[in-house]
């Protein structure tokens, strides 16, 4: 079967022939429809994030997949069902976090991540997955269901942010998303669909005309250009915000976000920064602001099957124009390299292995 | 009546004569028993925190009070009842946070704090308070009930910390308190009384023999000397911890605490740092650790009537030896200055205005 890999010797994605995997009892053989590409994939390809499976020189790419059950073996799934796989699997014996259904909360070193770190991903004609790492999707999501994974990541961050404020009567009204990549735009879209955030902002560093700015404004949000209005200036230029969602991985944002918050606000950090950057911060002022204004910061990574189910509901309820606008390219395996090209107008791309 | 004030002209506490206040309907006249002294009082006296009431050159000190209802007017209280007052009152018209019973979540500028900022405190033979800012205490707390305020501050921080982890199945086992002052020790005592924290640490910078180290060890916790084991070294020297409670206001602790956390852990910040200290941090590593390990940081200040009620229950259940060990001096008004002296062996002091 076709599979798209990166190898230790060749740091560009290549199409290779791999044997079709055989499902064992308890696992499911899935015929892949589409697999999305995101910033993490580019880091995996560049070798700055993740790693190869043990004893392997190649890694099958892809962690944002949708497919159709080809062989359910003895599981609760039926052939033909639409499914999306979660990303983490135990590295060795499952830890209690896996037993509790929350591998997303597991400690580094206790898991592999399919298509990212230590385990082959889903960019192949077929893949297998344990049934408990698969979530059924409604038929309406056949086209855009590969967005379930990134939407689930945003769902989890929003859940953690709201939970952090659940000890008191909190009535957020405004939110700011840092980043207008696909994860930032999906987070913004989820917030726009919620009742509790009337006023939305999204920060980027692009000039008009730009398709992401069009999406931001069509969602009813205000675009903020970080080149003219840095994060720390947002309260003065616009307003202090109840929630910040950091979706760029730019490390200074994690600290500036504290200043952008209204009293009792929360900053959720989704973007993963590179290691090793040391810089000055107004340390005691940030600490003071956290304490005296009851602010919170929550980090959030990955997502579990529960978040995938919530994401499927969310995705099914998002307006059609939105996914059409965010998904700027779906490329079949013959043209797979186009899915890994970052263009001025590209937002989210996917490789298509098959159609329903 | 007797009152203990600090004045713009004289930055040492003085005993003065003040007229006894008259309660208006809806408010209660309280005969003061004891008022505690904490670090905030010392900052108020030094002029580094808080401020005088509008148009006044003197501030009555004290925000940790217990007293007896002298005149309940038309309120739900009865004469003779033991009560503790909360600290914040509206500055001008009450904001929605006051209407919701959570002045502790109010924005700076919308409140005054009795004995701290813009309103006279409780260090007087009598004070008045709106009934909704008073909490009834059981008779058993007549001696140590002035600790209700600091215990309520710790209760709130613990509540916010736990809430921040409530979106998933979290099973904390270890906690680290930074600071062995009275707030740190009370926080440690509350954690020791809970079922969910088997392993406790408390960090200070004192040498044995020391009464705070004795308390820490009698509570079953391990004392960590920050001069030999800085916060960031605690995971290697002891273990990564599920919770950190920062009760010193030392700004670097707020950042080092992130490194001390186990995956999915939370750092609660209670101590209030001075403003204006800028320093270098391993910014992207901290950001990365927050995200990849799902860590949280929550700031917490003040407390509301609900936290006072929880604190009264907590305080009533603490072992007798503990409050006896923490309260190192109760001084009557004739010797009030002793309550403001910080000695090697003093932990928590109070001024006694009257006895039950």
UniProtKB/Swiss-Prot annotation, chains A, B:
Catalytic reaction equation(s): D-glucose + NAD(+) = D-glucono-1,5-lactone + NADH + H(+); D-glucose + NADP(+) = D-glucono-1,5-lactone + NADPH + H(+)
Enzyme Commission numbers on file: 1.1.1.47
UniProt cross-references to InterPro entries, sorted A to Z: ADH-like_N, Glc_1-DH_arc, Glu_dehyd_C, GroES-like_sf, NAD(P)-bd_dom_sf
Cleaved signal peptide residues: none
Enzyme type, top EC level: oxidoreductase
Pfam families xref list: ADH_N, Glu_dehyd_C
Positions of region (Disordered): 1-26, 86-107
Keyword Zinc carried by entry: yes
MF terms (GO), sorted A to Z: D-glucose binding; glucose 1-dehydrogenase (NAD+) activity; glucose 1-dehydrogenase (NADP+) activity; NAD+ binding; NADP+ binding; zinc ion binding
Cofactor(s) demanded: Zn(2+)
Biased composition regions of type Basic and acidic residues, renumbered to the chain: 8-21
PANTHER family, per database record: GLUCOSE 1-DEHYDROGENASE, ZINC-TYPE ALCOHOL DEHYDROGENASE-LIKE PROTEIN C1198.01-RELATED
Protein role: Catalyzes the NAD(P)(+)-dependent oxidation of D-glucose to D-gluconate via gluconolactone. Can utilize both NAD(+) and NADP(+) as electron acceptor. Is involved in the degradation of glucose through a modified Entner-Doudoroff pathway.
Name recorded for this polypeptide: Glucose 1-dehydrogenase
Organism in which the protein naturally occurs: Halobacterium salinarum (strain ATCC 700922 / JCM 11081 / NRC-1)
């Amino acid at each position: 079967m076709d599979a798209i890999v990166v190898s230790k010797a060749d740091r560009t994605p290549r199409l290779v022939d791999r044997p079709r995997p055989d499902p064992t009892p308890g696992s499911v053989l899935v015929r892949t429809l589409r697999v999305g590409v995101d910033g993490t994939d580019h880091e995996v390809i560049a070798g700055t994030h993740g790693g190869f499976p043990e004893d392997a020189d190649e890694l099958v790419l892809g962690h944002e997949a949708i497919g159709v059950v080809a062989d359910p073996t003895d599981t609760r799934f039926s052939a033909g069902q639409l499914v999306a796989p979660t990303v983490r699997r135990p590295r060795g014996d499952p830890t209690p976090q896996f037993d509790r259904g929350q591998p997303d909360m597991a400690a580094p070193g206790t898991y592999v991540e399919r298509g990212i770190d230590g385990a082959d991903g889903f960019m192949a004609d077929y893949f297998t997955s344990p049934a408990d790492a698969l979530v059924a999707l409604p038929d309406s999501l056949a086209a855009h269901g590969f967005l379930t994974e990134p939407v689930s990541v945003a769902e989890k961050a929003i859940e953690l942010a709201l939970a952090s404020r659940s000890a008191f009567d909190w009535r957020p009204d405004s939110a700011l998303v840092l980043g207008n990549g696909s994860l930032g735009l999906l987070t913004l879209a989820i917030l726009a669909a919620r009742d509790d955030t009337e006023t939305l902002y999204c920060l980027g560093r692009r000039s008009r005309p730009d398709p992401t700015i069009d999406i931001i404004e069509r969602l009813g949000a205000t675009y903020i250009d970080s080149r003219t209005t840095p994060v720390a200036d947002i309260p003065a230029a616009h307003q202090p915000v109840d929630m910040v969602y950091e979706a760029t991985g730019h490390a200074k944002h994690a600290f500036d976000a504290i200043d952008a918050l209204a009293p009792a606000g929360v900053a959720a950090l989704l973007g993963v920064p590179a290691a090793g950057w040391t810089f000055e911060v107004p340390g005691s002022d940030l600490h003071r602001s956290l304490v005296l204004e009851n602010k919170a910061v929550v980090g959030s990574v990955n997502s579990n099957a529960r978040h995938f189910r919530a994401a499927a509901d969310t995705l099914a309820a998002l307006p059609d124009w939105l996914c059409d606008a965010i998904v700027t390219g779906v490329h079949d395996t013959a043209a797979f390299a186009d899915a890994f090209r970052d263009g001025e107008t590209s937002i989210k791309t996917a490789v298509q292995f098959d159609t329903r």
